[in-house]
């Protein structure tokens, strides 16, 4: 009996233990099931959050990309609106304003013409560079009123400025062709405005072509005017420029530009200086205040006026830059280097006048003054314009226009 009772007790204990184990296991299983459900829900929630975040990022990236693409398009649109391609006009009934491209000797040439009175004498401005359109400065600097005394013709040579096109024949840009073009343009203007002669003014690099053309055909011109006249491409020119820049940088204590200056030149045994990098030299010249526009950088004096000019359309501005770059690589660029007009052009049959800014060391005014003193001509005079560097007509238009008016009065009827 005792053994049976003991077995019953053991059975009850085992049954109770088994029941406890079963209930515990069920509880654990339920907790594990609940735990799994929680984890799965959290994972699903986190995944949904991740997908939402990715969608948000994608949307933001699309917006950023659209903005990046839109900014240059907006700027291009604004630039196009700033570039209507229109030139000055006048209220006077007898005035003339024109902008056009025409064929000269088989190549496109561009013209800007401004004049308040058609009876005024014609002044042909032979552009700088060669390859740089100068009407941009007339567009930028509104105080210049030369058109009150002359019918002013700004000439863009073949394939430059508004005459540039993608079929430009760079091989045709030679000194002989440009001299022949100058003669043809002169004859066209004489015929169009019913004039026996005209005035011709060469500006900077354009003075090389204009001076040679006046020597070839003096019968076409009342007078020669050299503004920022190129006199020589010799070491003497480089030396005068160097001495000016060195003096300015030393007075400023500008060690950085002094170092750049020395890197750009070679000191010769003769005591002269030879420039090894013209573009660095000109950049330093602007820094020193003797460049295109006094006390203005190359960007301020040249690039910004081109960008903001109203006289060009957007496509014409692009053509302007392409043409300018093309001209630097032409045969003309080689043919007009290594010159010295003190040796090759010592006499003119027409009156000769020279206009330089007091701070012009691109074409140093001292060399221009000395050239004026040595050249033989029926009349001659050197004008030094205060407050100006390389572009006196636009930097100090009042004094420069007064000088040109005086030239007209002394030569037109004399």
Describe the residue ranges of each PLM region.
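Alpha/beta-hydrolase
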Residues: 255-343, 350
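Short beta-strand/loop motif that positions the catalytic acidic residue
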Residues: 348, 354-356, 360
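The serine-hydrolase catalytic nucleophile loop
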Residues: 130-142
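Conserved alpha/beta-hydrolase
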Residues: 146-164
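Conserved acidic catalytic loop of the alpha/beta-hydrolase fold
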Residues: 177-197
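Conserved hydrolase catalytic core segment
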Residues: 196-235
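Catalytic histidine-centered segment of alpha/beta-hydrolase-like enzymes
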Residues: 388-397
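A catalytic-pocket lid/entrance helix-loop region that shapes and gates access to the active site
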Residues: 222-267
């Amino acid at each position: 009996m005792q053994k049976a009772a003991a077995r019953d007790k053991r059975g009850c204990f085992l049954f109770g233990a088994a029941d406890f184990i079963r209930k515990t296991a069920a509880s654990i299983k339920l907790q594990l099931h609940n735990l799994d459900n929680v984890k799965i829900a959290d994972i699903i929630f986190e995944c949904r959050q991740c997908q939402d975040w990715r969608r948000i990022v994608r949307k933001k990236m699309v917006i950023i990309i659209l903005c990046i693409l839109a900014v240059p398009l907006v700027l291009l649109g604004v630039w196009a609106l700033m570039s209507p391609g229109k030139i000055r006009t006048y209220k006077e009934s007898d005035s003339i304003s024109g902008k056009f491209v025409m064929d000269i000797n088989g190549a496109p040439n561009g013209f800007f013409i401004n004049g308040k009175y058609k009876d005024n004498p014609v002044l042909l401005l032979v552009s700088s560079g060669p390859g740089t359109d100068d009407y941009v400065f007339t567009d930028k600097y509104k105080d210049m009123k030369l058109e009150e005394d002359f019918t002013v013709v700004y000439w863009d040579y073949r394939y430059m400025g508004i005459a540039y096109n993608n079929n430009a024949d760079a091989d045709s840009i030679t000194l002989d062709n440009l001299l022949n073009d100058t003669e043809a343009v002169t004859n066209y203007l004489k015929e169009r405005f019913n004039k026996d002669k005209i005035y011709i003014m060469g500006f900077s690099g354009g003075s090389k072509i204009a001076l040679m053309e006046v020597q070839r055909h003096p019968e076409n011109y009342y007078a020669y005017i050299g503004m920022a006249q190129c006199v020589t491409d010799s070491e003497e020119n480089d030396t005068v420029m160097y001495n000016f820049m060195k003096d300015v940088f030393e007075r400023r204590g500008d060690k950085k530009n002094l170092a750049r200056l020395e890197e750009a030149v070679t000191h010769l045994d003769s005591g002269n200086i030879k420039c090894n990098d013209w573009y660095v030299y000109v950049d330093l010249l602007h820094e020193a205040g003797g460049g295109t526009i006094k006390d203005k950088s190359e960007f301020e004096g040249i690039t910004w006026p081109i960008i903001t000019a109203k006289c060009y359309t957007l496509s014409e501005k692009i053509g302007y830059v392409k043409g300018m770059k093309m001209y630097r690589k032409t045969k003309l660029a080689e043919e007009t280097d290594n010159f010295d007009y003190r040796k090759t052009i010592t006499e003119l049959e027409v009156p000769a006048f020279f206009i330089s800014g007091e701070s012009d060391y691109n074409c140093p005014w001292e060399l221009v003054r000395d050239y004026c003193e040595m050249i033989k001509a029926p009349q001659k005079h050197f004008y030094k314009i205060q407050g100006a560097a390389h572009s006196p007509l636009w930097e100090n238009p009042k004094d420069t226009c007064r000088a040109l008016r005086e030239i007209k009065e002394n030569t037109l009827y004399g």
